Amino acid sequence: GDMVIHPRLVEDHVEHARRGHFSQGVRIPLDAHATLVQLAPSAGIQGSLAPGLGGLRRGYAFRLPAMSVLLRRAANSIIAIKSCNQGFWRRDLLAVNGFDEEMRGWGSEDKELCARLENAGIRRQTLLFAAIAFHLDHPPASRGSAAANLALWRETVRSGRTRCDAGIDRHRP
């Protein structure tokens, strides 16, 4: 994977889990140098002290769970949807049939899933200052499918659909 998670990430997702909501943790991008430091054998999660963090990225690396509770709705407008650090109730994810496998490659698959959840009445809560994960630097994936995926997301938003046809059900007995 391309993420290094805070040792208490799962605990944070469990602590903040609420029925009728899915959780979005924070993804903090690391630069090339910080990635090398994090991948060193002696490295541990350094949180806000991690090298290569500046400005807002350093601020997001502070773990302050009590503050997270106060900001979980307001932070939705600050933190983008990123499926690399989300928490769902199993029944909610099954109800919308998970990720739409019609989407190919990079782009909008996470936004499309969240749109279906919200269309189904499941609300997003952002865990700012909790559920922290660092994204390791690497060459970007091909954006060749981005426009087609974005069109699928827009159609989900426009139509209000809550389920996809090509999802988890394909893999269940």
Regions found by a protein language model. Give the residues of each.
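Conserved donor NDP-sugar-binding/catalytic core segment of glycosyltransferases
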Residues: D2-G54
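Active-site donor/metal-binding and catalytic loop motifs
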Residues: L127-G144
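Short, flexible, basic/aromatic active-site loop/helix in glycosyltransferases
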Residues: S42-I79
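A short, conserved alpha-helix in the catalytic core of glycosyltransferases
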Residues: I81, N85-N97, M103-R123, L128-F129
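Conserved hydrophobic/aromatic beta-strand scaffold that supports enzyme active sites
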Residues: F22, N85-G87, A133
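Short low-complexity, flexible loop/linker segments enriched in glycine and/or proline
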Residues: V37-L39, R116-E118, P140-G144
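Terminal low-complexity segments of carbohydrate-biosynthetic enzymes
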Residues: C84, D92, N119-R123, S145-P173
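Short Asp/Glu-rich motifs
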Residues: A32, E112, L136-H138
